[in-house]
Design a protein with these regions (language model features):
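Short, acidic, small-residue-rich periplasmic hinge/interaction motif at the N-terminus
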Residues: 29-32, 40-45, 72-78, 88-132, ...
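A beta-strand signature from Gram-negative outer-membrane beta-barrel systems
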Residues: 94, 197-240
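Conserved C-terminal beta-signal and adjacent last beta-strands/turns
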Residues: 5-8, 19, 309-312, 348, ...
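Short acidic/polar hinge/loop motifs at secondary-structure boundaries
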Residues: 60-63, 182-210, 229, 326
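Membrane-embedded beta-barrel scaffold of Gram-negative outer-membrane proteins
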Residues: 369, 375-381, 544, 550-558, ...
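Transmembrane beta-barrel wall of Gram-negative outer-membrane proteins
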Residues: 238-240, 245-276, 281-318, 364-371, ...
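Extracytoplasmic beta-strand/coil segments of soluble accessory domains associated
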Residues: 140-182, 204
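Gram-negative outer-membrane beta-barrel transporters
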Residues: 499, 601-603, 623-712, 783
Length: 786
């Protein structure tokens, strides 16, 4: 009897043990720097169970029975590692990965990025973080929760024409590179994300630098820089599909696939995407398509990668904004394309008031390991863009289109209705290079680029006229040509003075030559020949108080040339801008939290600030203002509150002032110490996440932007009200048989239905115009990964 009881107890205990389930949690780190690795994959071998590390480098795999497991841990740019775990209770492990001895795609962006010892201010955003939020909105909206960043959307729903400002600086002052290749338009200096829709789904990582930052290719950063790296090598074959749909008939379809590494040498990746939306604003529709294709050879000491990507966008124009009275009575009214009767009432709309543009990019990157301490990267690139704005012009004077009056017997007709297209056909090509040296205490990069924006044709076509005899079909009413040469060379040296103290020196020379000929759309001759020689030095120190704490300080000088709009719309020839930028801060990283506090001072001479006016195609007009400054404090941090709760937050307090601004609206009026246009004193962002249960995450995303002035006179009636917006996001992932992952996501934008505008303008008439944003709206997405 006693023996029977023992046997029965043993059976019960063993059954209980088998029934018990445990979890494996852990952190993945860089074995060299001890920094956490966000976005690393952790897979249980021979099982369809996996996890991806979060922003703290953490992972969790739950509901596992007792047993022995082998975990395969991978992260791009690092050697994969197998970790064995014997599971009889909940286990927590720390895994360190060694950097890959084989060259990786990261070398392409290494020269233009900052690292933890660089004494400048920056934020890294992983592709994993982008994908959680990527329901089809443009890149600016996905970066909305990085410090000191404000986003705009003409259509009001984040699809179509969008923009961003960093520390109050507009898009023309933010340097954007894709794989180290300049993306900003050479003439306008603007960044048109709409031309490469859904670029986020082909992005491996983004680094946002604030202030001047480190030397980069293209125009100097006068407010910040955004550095994108596209898809890196994935060693295993994959296929992915994303389907999203929601409010305003917004739809997104994306297909991605890759071969993985073939014969340990070759890899190919492809993506196609389609996004459509009716927009929140009336008729502000978007029809966007994009593609990405890459092929690479990965040798032990050589990487050769060819990339092509691009897009086609057709958007209905919505860049005029609405005055305050219209905002109150008809928020979604869109004056673009409106047709008026003699009494000034809207009688209809022109159905093809569109922007239609194609842009194709080609890049070839060659990376070579020269020795144990030297590697080199050479890149060639070519971009071809072409497209037009189409507009219906009511009562347009013939003389405005270079036409003679029409004489019919005793009647002279001097105006009429026309449909015109304003064309831009341009090419951008060149090469970049960098040589990188890394040994013990010394890190040295020598790099540069030569790029030409050439054969750029600006011209206007008349495609229809009310009076047929007044013009010919597709007759040109203006023609202009432009060319811009841009050369730069830089050297960056980071030296370890002691185990705790690092010195950083960054010296750059840049040459710009800009020439134009012909007329602009106002038929005024546009003949420019300008040359600039800039020297942009930077220097700083970083000091490691401990393995977790770094203090840094740097000072940088930058110079920047005017853009095309400055020349065209300026009453006097614009001057180039000069900037002195001081950055000082403290970074702390621990297993549980990361925190950064920094102070910045940006002193400008002849800053080209926004006047608050827009030109006839929605481009902001700027003017030199003598001396001005931006100064502030930025706080940012990420903390793991509990095993399930984490919080990522940032806040900026700043002052943005013109010391001596001269306003000229008929009467010259000198203004002292006025606020710089569209530069809020307060900006804050928050992402509060809860891993409610296995593979289910809920995130509350919050954004506060303070009051902004719409011109530089600091007139209280010309302001953009502060706003506080909350979004709610749900992400749930499953691992059904036969699939790597099935993801289900829901995004509730503007949870509390706040009526707000994210952007505004004034045309010098004392009237404020606003760009309203959507109230509560929804997007749902399904992601399939194989």
């Amino acid at each position: 009897m006693f023996k029977s009881m023992i046997v029965a107890a043993a059976v019960l205990l063993s059954t209980h043990a088998i029934a018990q389930q445990f979890s494996i949690t852990g952190t993945v780190k860089n074995g060299k720097s001890n920094q956490v690795l966000a976005g690393a994959s952790v897979q249980l071998e021979n099982q369809n169970r996996f996890a991806v590390t979060d922003e703290f480098g953490r992972f969790r795999i739950e509901k596992l029975p007792v047993g022995d497991y082998s975990m395969l841990i991978r992260f791009i740019g690092f050697q994969e590692k197998t970790e064995n775990v014997s599971l009889t209770q909940n286990v927590n492990v720390t895994v360190t990965l060694d950097e890959s001895v084989q060259l990786t795609d990261e070398v392409v962006v290494y020269a233009t990025r900052a690292n933890e010892k660089t004494p400048t201010t920056f934020t890294n955003v992983s592709g994993q973080a982008l994908s959680k939020q990527n329901f089809g909105q443009d890149m600016p909206l996905l970066l909305n929760w990085t410090p000191s960043l404000v986003t705009t959307s003409d259509a009001g729903a984040g699809v179509g024409y969008t923009g961003l400002r960093i520390r109050g600086s507009d898009a023309s002052r933010i340097n954007v590179t894709i794989n180290g290749i300049p993306y900003n338009d050479s003439e306008s200096q603007g960044t048109y994300w709409v031309d490469i829709p859904d670029v986020a789904s082909s992005t491996q990582s983004v680094q946002v630098q604030r202030g001047v930052g480190t030397s980069t290719n293209g125009g100097s950063a006068f407010g910040g820089s955004v550095n994108l790296q596209t898809t890196s090598l994935r060693t295993d074959p994959y296929a992915e599909g994303m389907i999203a749909a929601g409010s305003f008939n917004t739809q997104r379809y994306t297909m991605k696939a890759g071969t993985g590494l073939i014969n340990d040498r070759w890899a190919f990746d492809a993506k196609v995407s389609k996004i459509t939306s009716d927009g929140y604003v009336d008729r502000a529709s978007s029809d966007l398509g994009s593609y990405y294709l890459s092929g690479g050879y990965y040798g032990k000491k050589t990487v050769i990668k060819a990339i092509t990507f691009g897009g086609h966008e057709k958007t209905y124009q919505s860049w005029n904004g609405n005055d305050s009275e219209t905002i109150k009575t008809n928020r979604t009214f869109n004056s673009a394309g409106a047709l008026y009767d003699e009494a000034g009432n809207v009688k209809g709309y022109y159905d093809n008031e569109i922007d239609n543009y194609n842009q194709d990019h080609y890049q070839l990157h060659v990376t070579q390991q020269l020795s144990d301490h030297w590697n080199a990267n050479v890149s060639l690139h070519y971009t071809y863009g072409r497209g037009y704005y189409e507009q219906y012009k009511q009562g347009k004077a013939f003389s405005d289109l270079g036409l003679n009056d029409l004489v019919l017997k005793d009647t002279i007709i001097s105006s009429g209705d026309f449909i015109v297209r304003k064309w831009l056909d341009n090419k951008f090509y060149g090469g970049t290079f960098s040589f990188n040296y890394d040994k013990e205490k010394t890190n040295l990069t020598i790099g540069g680029a030569f790029n030409q924006y050439g054969h750029a044709k600006h011209y206007g076509e008349i495609i229809w006229a009310q009076y047929a005899a007044s013009s010919q079909i597709r007759q040109h009413y203006y023609d202009g040509l432009s060319q811009k040469n841009d050369f730069n060379i830089y050297a960056k040296w980071n030296y370890e003075i002691s185990p705790a103290l690092n010195a950083f020196i960054d010296l750059q020379y840049r040459y710009v030559g800009y020439t134009t000929a012909g007329t602009d759309d106002d038929l005024v001759p546009y003949d420019i020949s300008d040359k600039f020689n800039f020297f942009n030095p930077k220097a700083g120190l970083s000091y490691s108080l401990s393995a977790k704490d770094i203090l840094y300080a740097s000072y940088a000088i930058a110079n920047r040339e005017p853009n095309r709009t400055d020349y065209v719309n300026g009453d006097v020839k614009p001057k180039h801008e000069k900037l002195g930028n001081l950055e000082a801060g403290w970074r702390r990283n621990s297993d549980r939290y990361a925190f950064e506090a920094n102070y910045y001072l940006m002193n400008y001479t002849d800053q080209l600030v926004l006047t608050g006016k827009l030109d006839n195609v929605g481009n902001p007009i700027r003017a030199n203002v003598g001396k001005s400054y931006r100064t502030g404090v930025e706080l940012s941090g990420t903390i793991r509150l509990t095993e399930r709760w984490s919080w990522n937050a940032n806040a900026t307090w700043s002052r943005n002032k013109n010391k001596d601004y001269v306003a000229d609206f008929g009467n010259v009026d000198e203004k002292k110490n006025t606020s710089i246009v569209l530069s809020p004193d307060w900006i804050a962002g928050s992402q509060l996440s809860c891993n409610a249960f296995r593979n289910f995450q809920v995130t509350l995303l919050s954004k506060y932007v303070g009051k902004q002035y719409l011109d530089n006179t600091q007139t209280e009636s010309l302001t953009l009200d502060s706003y506080f917006i909350n979004d709610l996001r749900f992400n749930y992932t499953l691992s059904p048989r036969g699939m790597k992952e099935l993801g289900l996501s829901l995004l509730v934008n503007n949870l509390f239905d706040v009526k707000y505008s994210s952007n505004g303008a004034t045309y010098g008439d004392g009237v404020a115009y606003y760009f309203p944003q959507a109230g509560t709206n929804f997007m749902a997405m399904m992601t399939l990964k194989f």
